[in-house]
Every structure is written in structure tokens, then in C-alpha cells.
Amino acid sequence: MSQPPGTNIFTVSRLNSTVRKLLEMEMGQVWLSAEISNFSQPSSGHWYFTLKDDTAQVRCAMFRNGNRRVTFRPQNGQQVLVRATITLYEPRGDYQLIAESMQPAGDGLLQQQFDQLKQRLMAEGLFEQAHKQPLPDPARQVGVITSSSGAALHDVLRVLQRRDPSLPVVIYPTPVQGAEAPTGIVRAIELANARKECDVLIVGRGGGSLEDLWSFNDERVARAIFASRIPIVSAVGHETDVTIADFVADLRAPTPSAAAELVSRDQIERLRQLQQQQQRMEMAMDYYLARQQSTFTRLQHRLQQQHPQLRLARQQTALMKVQRRLDDALQQHLRQATRRQEQLGQRLNAFRPEMRIERASQQLQQWQYRLRQAMQQRLGTGKQHFGQLAARLEGVSPLATLARGFSVTSTAEGQVVKKTGQLHQGDTLKTRLDDGWIESEVTAITPLKKTRRRST
């Protein structure tokens, strides 16, 4: 076995320190695109997590002073871009990263930018309902701001042709995707406002990914929509797609086809409204003629009412009514007098002495019966209580104790003897038994010795 050279023998501490310095000097800072897992934040405020891809992972730490500058809260499973320094934790020999900055990657970055712009514009009041302009009803001419080759334009024109072929349409072609798209959309909105050809604008495009729709999340486009003096309907993507333009626009349509529905009037609906107006005019004319006919009939009736024979007939009818009312009044008075007489007779019978005496006698008998019952009940209760007290008194009586074989001894002076220390030899004692008294003389006194209990 060969002997190791004396100058190249490493301790574990020295080896880990050397490897750490090599990693830090050779690698320096690196950028990583990875997925976060095992994220934790203890009370110290530092972040500890793992960065991984499909086949590998590495531990990572981000100290409190660095993570304060991160504008989002990392979540497990989130894709991020991390700038970090490679190092080695010497006590355990674990290779790890110290993150210095972090930002979302891919759609996560776009979503963060979307949320930040949304909050800023909301704080400025660009989304408030008070700034929304009403759509014209009906629209005289519609402007469409979209790509001239996209499916959105085809959908809008198809719906407008079906619903209202007579409605004029002005197309303001512009790119809706790519770096130049926001500038083109803003220029088209400003051109439509300058020409004043249309009284409503549709701004939008077909569906796509978040990156495809990003032109409508541009701040320049949002401010151009807000500044437009012509009402704007946003129609970007599908119903689930939401952009900044949707929040700023005067009205949001879920699709370009739906936007065309909102700004146009259906021919069939217009025909139905025309028919309803015609029906209302006919009903108004019928009502006017009916009122005139009613007025004529009323005047004719009033003229007929002034005929002398008709007036005489009315007087005779009134006389018959008065006579009938007089007969009814006499009959009513007679019925009331008869009913009054019957009531007085009933009251007189009620005050007869015999009936009052009979009722008083019955009541007296009831009281006597109730008094006897109460006395018997009270006497029984008293006897029972007396028996209970006598039994209790008997239980504590000294005489009862004597009957069980006990006796009570007292001195000649009548003092009850309880201990031997009260007596002297030659004293006379009196002892009470159950059936009498005996007298005796003390001839000897023998106190009992107290026994001590052993402690266990």
C-alpha cells in the first residue's frame, strides 16, 4: 500500500472550502429557467426552495434583503427566471444556489405585466362607468378596426349583412399582432376620430394565446380607446379572453360576431317594430272614433231626458219610492218597540226575589261543603305533622336511651358525671335507670390508661 504525500492530504473542511471557492470563482452568476417546488418561508423571512426541470433539481435560497425586491409571491409549480450565485454549504457539503433576483417566466411574466397595468389604469379611473359612452341607437355607420385578412373582419361583415344590409361599414385595416400592432391600432382609432365618418367603432381580432392578444394589453392602445370621442366596442378573442382594452372600452363583446350584433339592428326586428307602430296608430284612431261616438250618444240621451212625459214618469216613480220608504220606516219602528218590550220583560224576571234567594242558597251550600273539606284536610295534615315531630322527639329523648340499657350518673349536687376526675372516694352518687333511681358510695377510683396508636 503506497503512502499518501504529506502535502496533499485534505481535511473535509478544507476540501469543502476549496470546492466552494472554485465554484464561486469559475461559475460566478448564472441565469436559470426552472420550476419552483418545496417553497418555504420561515420566521426569518428568507426563502428556501428547489429549482427543477424534468430530470434534475438543485436547492436554492433567497435571503430576506433580496426577496423584498420580488414583485410577486412565488408558488410551487411556477416557472421562473432566476439570477443566482453557485456556492457550496460547507458544513454539509451541499451544492446550492443563492438567488439574487427572480421574475416570472413565459406567460407568468406577461400575466404579471397585465396585472400591474390593470391596477395602475384602474387607479387612474380609466375603467370607471362614468366615462363610458352610450352606443348610438340606431347606428348610422359602423367602423371596424382589425386586420383586413383576419377571420374577425369576415365574421363582423357576415353578421352585419345578415342583420342590416343597409348599414354602411368603414374598415380601418391595421395589424393586430406583433411589435407594430399597438402603433397601428392607435393610429386607426385616431384616424376614425379625425374623419368623423362613423358613430360607433368595433376594435378587435379573433382568438389566440396570451402573446397573440398582447397588442390589446398595450398601454398606448388603452389610452387611445379612453380618449376616443366615438364609442368603442371591444371584441378581442373568445368569451374567456379578457384584455385591458375590454376594461377601457365603452362596451365589451365576447366575440367579433357578438360586437356586430350589438351595433346593428335586425331587419326583422325593425319590420316588427314598424308593424307595432302601425297597430298603435290604428288603435289610437279607433279609440278617437269611439270617444266621438260616445259623446254623440251622451248628447242624444240628454236631449231625450228633457221630454215632458219622461219628466212626469220620473216624478211618479219618485213618489212611489217615498211612499215605500215610509211604510218600511213604520214597520221597522214597530219591530223595534216589540223587541224592546221583550227585553224589559226578561230583565224584570231576572230581578225576582225567589230566584235570587235560590241562587244564594246554592252558593251557601257550596261554601259550606268547601269549608268542611278544607278543615278535614287541614286536620289530617296537622295530625301527620304531629306524629312526625313526636317520632323525632322520641328518637332524641334521654329516656329512650335508658330503655336500651344505659344509665345516667350524677353527683349529690346534680352534676352529671363524665370523668373520674370529678369524683373522690366516699362521694355519694345518684344513678338514673329506666324504671327508677339508685344511690351508691364511691369506694374506689380506677382511671383507664389511654392507649397510643402505632403509626404505620
From Swiss-Prot:
Keywords noted in UniProt: Cytoplasm, Exonuclease, Hydrolase, Nuclease
The protein's enzyme class: hydrolase
GO MF annotation list: exodeoxyribonuclease VII activity; nucleic acid binding
Gene Ontology process terms (BP): DNA catabolic process
Record EC number: 3.1.11.6
InterPro entries per the UniProt record, alphabetical: Exonuc_VII_L (IPR003753), Exonuc_VII_lsu_C (IPR020579), OB-fold_nuc-bd_dom (IPR025824)
Alphabetized CDD domains for the sequence: ExoVII_LU_OBF
Superkingdom of the organism of origin: Bacteria
Positions in coiled-coil regions: none
Quaternary structure and interacting proteins, as annotated: Heterooligomer composed of large and small subunits.
Family, as annotated: Belongs to the XseA family.
Function: Bidirectionally degrades single-stranded DNA into large acid-insoluble oligonucleotides, which are then degraded further into small acid-soluble oligonucleotides.
Protein's name according to its UniProt entry: Exodeoxyribonuclease 7 large subunit
Organism: Erwinia tasmaniensis (strain DSM 17950 / CFBP 7177 / CIP 109463 / NCPPB 4357 / Et1/99)
Gene that specifies this protein: xseA
